[in-house]
Amino acid sequence: MPTINQLVRKPRKSKVEKSDSPALNIGYNSHKKVHTKLAAPQKRGVATRVGTMTPKKPNSALRKFARVRLSNLIEVTAYIPGIGHNLQEHSVVLIRGGRVKDLPGVRYHIVRGALDTAGVTDRKQGRSKYGTKKPKA
């Protein structure tokens, strides 16, 4: 344990908080070709690869994912939520933060019902999370 004098000479360092979704905290000025510190809640990108991957140990499934090149030129892996999707290579998608616990390296979600991504069909409950319109009564 340090003495008061040691703390006066060299105070304690505060912990640096690390972002859960770092690609959303970087902007890009295409005019000057420089990265900026412009944070955003969502970002637009182009899907460069769409596929499935298997989750970590206790779970078993084929989870859908897309490799996305964002508007700030960073490439990330994003999860495609819901049952069924219409994404393919060169689809324009909107991503938000939020990791998938059993997929290593997947820190982003694709927003359903935005840009080229269609909402989940035949969904009755929790529709807003999956971009589904209200069914006709």
Curated annotation (Swiss-Prot):
Tagged with keyword tRNA-binding: yes
GO cellular component, as recorded: small ribosomal subunit
Gene3D superfamilies according to UniProt: Nucleic acid-binding proteins
Listed Pfam families: Ribosom_S12_S23 (PF00164)
Tree of life domain: Bacteria
Region named Disordered: 1-21, 34-57
Xref: SUPFAM superfamilies: Nucleic acid-binding proteins
GO biological process per UniProt: translation
UniProt keywords, alphabetically: Ribonucleoprotein, Ribosomal protein, RNA-binding, rRNA-binding, tRNA-binding
GO molecular function: rRNA binding; structural constituent of ribosome; tRNA binding
Subunit field text: Part of the 30S ribosomal subunit. Contacts proteins S8 and S17. May interact with IF1 in the 30S initiation complex.
NCBIfam families in UniProt: rpsL_bact
Family listed: Belongs to the universal ribosomal protein uS12 family.
Protein's job: With S4 and S5 plays an important role in translational accuracy.
HAMAP family linked: Ribosomal_uS12_B (MF_00403_B)
Designated name of the protein: Small ribosomal subunit protein uS12
